[in-house]
UniProtKB/Swiss-Prot annotation:
Name of the featured protein: Chaperonin GroEL 1
Organism, as annotated: Protochlamydia amoebophila (strain UWE25)
Record keyword Transit peptide present: no
Gene Ontology biological process: protein refolding
Catalytic reactions on record: ATP + H2O + a folded polypeptide = ADP + phosphate + an unfolded polypeptide
Amino acid sequence: MAKLLQFNEEALKSILKGVKTLAKAVKVTLGPKGRNVVINKGFGSPLSTKDGVTVAKEVVLKDKFENMGAQLVNQVAAKTSDVAGDGTTTAIVLAEAIYSAGVKNVAAGANPMSLKRGIDQAVETITRSLDHLSTPVNTAQEVRQIATISANNDGEIGRIIGEAMERVGKDGIITVAEAKGIETHVDYVEGMQFDKGYVSPYFITNAEQMSVELSNADILITDKKLSAAKDIIPVLEKIMEKGARPLLIIAEDIDGEALATLVVNKLKAGMTVCAVKAPGFGDRRKAMLQDIAILTGGKVVSEEVGLKLDEVGPEVLGRAKTIKVSKEETTIIDGAGQSNEVKSRLAQIKAELANASTSKYDKEKLEERLAKMVGGVAVVNVGAATETELKEKKARVEDALHATRAAVAQGIVPGGGVALLRAVKSLEKLQLTGDEAIGVTIIKQAAFAPAIAIANNCGKQGNLIAEKIYEATGSYGYDGLTDEFKDLLKAGVIDPVLVTKSALINAASIAGLLLTTAAMITDKPQPKSQPAGMPGMDGMGGMGMGGMGGMGGMGMM
């Protein structure tokens, strides 16, 4: 297939056009008075959103060279969203500002590689300064303020997320789901819960709620599949000798004679027992069984560690104060595990989370395990009157949740673009020369871009507002919602420092990459082929009626 090529200045200009088009679509959403963007995906109802990364993902340009620039900057939004969960619009605004200034300087004769070195050093200096500016999140009020701002100044969402985080703790997990009604509410789950219910309804103890409820129960945990009666009878006899406590059995699977034996003991011998399948699959199942064992003070009966069901007794059992089992899930509350062992297990899971090589999917599963271990799970059920409103509101809740987690993890800085304009003053210490010094100047100018965009969206002269913020000190800045200059930290206009740092780092990284581009290659568009006519149609032109003249001699005899 033939290719199209562009080189040097021509390539940089095509990229710039694509970057500017993308930024124009995204920039309008920034700040407290940012506008929504309506997206028609070609199916279902249109989506109205104020989420930068959602808008950026939908931008695909007709010109292939321009589209390459747009898609590369699109990665800025995606990466920032992955790391910090918010700040995607800020990242794109910064990327446009850095790249635009860089292209002008390259056109004027600056060396792109030297510019990039200066840009990288400037970004490193600013991120260190942002760390010094940040303050830890100390109060529930600050958590609510962060959530409110990230949810487009929706106080209800801020309150809900603030209360949820206060309830489940910083290690607890908060998930977002769609409610069946129009009200937004939070459901809390106490203890360790996993998505496996009873394997037989004969185990039910509460007929009204169709559930199994066990108090002060023993727990037998094994990774073995239980099918034959001989798999279960020896250990049951040893447990019964100890005393008739309620018993929960967690195994890979339970069926056949083994299940029948348990049901008969429940119905005829009056034994309070319930069996559930082990959660997860493969190595994750083994890890979760070990989590349950540590939390309840028991051991996983596994031949891998030299334990066989027919040889063990009550010493391998875990214990919990309350166990609730429904058709679809099991909840273990107040396990009897040793606190030092539980803390050690939590530290191990956190270490795996901190490992850079851990995939995003694995991190999500590790976070779930961490939350289950500490017994804190909250589900925010988002309600709305229409499907379009529901999608938009759910996206805002997810933004707010991510931003709040980032703030709790690393602290907060003044919002409204103020933090960058304070941190940029640290660049005065950098003693660079030539084109590297120009790279530093590019970052200094780009630091004004978020504050300018916020003020412009509020109907103000962005350049004047940003200059006034730069000349001030501390947390003094422009509150676009009230149209006032004030101490933004006290006013609750705050950003997680991780969001601000991630936006700058990712924007500078991709802009520097684009500046050093010397050639672009893409497929040449193929002309659309015309639909072919029916074969033989052209040859039918001679079949006029005159061709049938010879039939005149075929009169009736």
